[in-house]
Regions:
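Bacterial Sec-dependent N-terminal signal peptides
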Residues: 1-24
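Acidic/polar surface patches and capping/hinge elements
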Residues: 20-247
């Protein structure tokens, strides 16, 4: 009798173990893994105090990396290669190998993020923790290893693509010259921040041919005359600032 009970217990344990391992796919396909990874990138962007244009560049390349590593999970989605300027064909998954594309996407996103921010250690610490969560879900070693490797391949291609967008070249260009005359823009209190990214137009665009496709109208002509359009617009801004409410 005892041997029968022991056999039943072993069988039950085996069934539970198999069921738990079979559930890893559902657990690992949870979009929260990707959402949390992007949130971590946001937190580091804020910590490192990147300007909005530079932050937008980080978001663009990291999310393209995640998409490119994940889109093979659904045949309805296609690669952005050939659609975004300068992005050529990316590595494809090896036929016959098992993958968790959610893990591949998270790994690709975080690897690209580490290449673009100052606080690499913060991203690395988060990455180590979230990869352990994938592993703890019961993902088979073969799937785990192949998914990490594929995410790394995609990340490498995206990092190489990003390196050619002329961002690095703009780091050594001259700052925006601030004029002394009354018509010139000047940094304002309280931070007196310098003009942000005056050479951003020199970066490779993602989709449009150039900024000329959406050329804005020229700014209102400066004038201190109280009847001028410039004076009216400037006063409207001042009045709005003076009448702000807590909301």
């Amino acid at each position: 009798m005892k041997s029968i009970i022991l056999s039943l217990l072993l069988l039950a344990t085996s069934i539970i173990s198999v069921a738990q391992k079979a559930g890893w796919k559902k657990a690992c396909d949870n979009p929260e893994f990707l959402h949390r990874s992007i949130k971590e990138v946001t937190d580091v962007i804020v910590h490192d105090i990147y300007s909005p244009p530079v932050a937008s560049r980080i978001y663009a390349y990291t999310t393209v990396a995640a998409y490119e590593a994940a889109h093979f999970s659904d045949s309805k989605y296609i690669s952005l290669a050939g659609q975004l300027h300068g992005l050529s064909a990316l590595p494809a998954p090896t036929a016959g190998k098992p993958y968790c594309y959610s893990l591949a996407a998270v790994n690709a996103l975080l690897l690209v993020a580490k290449s673009m921010i100052i606080s690499e250690d913060k991203i690395a610490a988060f990455q180590a923790g979230i990869l352990l969560e994938f592993k703890a879900a019961g993902m088979p070693d073969e799937v785990y290893d192949s998914s990490l490797a594929y995410g790394k391949l995609v990340a490498g291609s995206i990092i190489a693509w990003a390196a050619k967008d002329h961002y690095k070249e703009t780091r050594s260009l001259s700052k925006y010259p601030v004029g002394n005359d009354t018509t010139s823009w000047k940094p304002t209190p309280p931070a007196y921040i310098k003009a942000i990214e005056p050479h951003w137009d020199k970066l490779r665009p993602f989709l449009i041919d150039s900024a000329q496709q959406f050329k804005p109208l020229p700014p209102t002509t400066f004038s201190a005359d109280k009847g001028s359009q410039f004076y009216k617009e400037a006063k409207a801004v001042m009045d709005a600032g003076l009448s702000l409410t807590p909301e």
